């Protein structure tokens, strides 16, 4: 879970920016988008296979 503690002299805008950055680093939005619709086992395998190819290419 992502938490942002507001500093004493910190504005809401900067805290919101930090929160958005932490959420994107944690991959929460990508996970929510992926789980929005049911994914069949075949689609899961295909997604994982593509991710593996991407990882190999950038190594």
Swiss-Prot record:
Q: Determine if Ribonucleoprotein is one of this entry's keywords.
A: yes
What GO terms in the biological process aspect are recorded for it?
translation
Q: Which InterPro entries match?
A: Ribosomal_bS21, Ribosomal_bS21_CS, Ribosomal_bS21_sf
Q: Does the keyword Ribosomal protein apply?
A: yes
The GO cellular component terms are:
ribonucleoprotein complex; ribosome
What UniProt keywords are attached to this protein's entry?
Ribonucleoprotein, Ribosomal protein
Entry's Gene Ontology molecular function annotations: structural constituent of ribosome
What the entry lists under NCBIfam families is as follows: S21p (TIGR00030)
In the record, the note on similarity to other proteins reads: Belongs to the bacterial ribosomal protein bS21 family.
Name of protein: Small ribosomal subunit protein bS21
Q: Which organism is it from?
A: Acaryochloris marina (strain MBIC 11017)
């Amino acid at each position: 879970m992502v938490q942002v503690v507001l500093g004493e002299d910190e504005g809401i805008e900067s805290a919101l920016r930090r929160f958005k950055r932490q959420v994107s680093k944690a991959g929460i939005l990508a996970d929510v988008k992926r789980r929005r619709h049911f994914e069949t086992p075949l689609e899961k395998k295909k997604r994982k296979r593509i991710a593996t190819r991407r990882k190999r290419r950038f190594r």
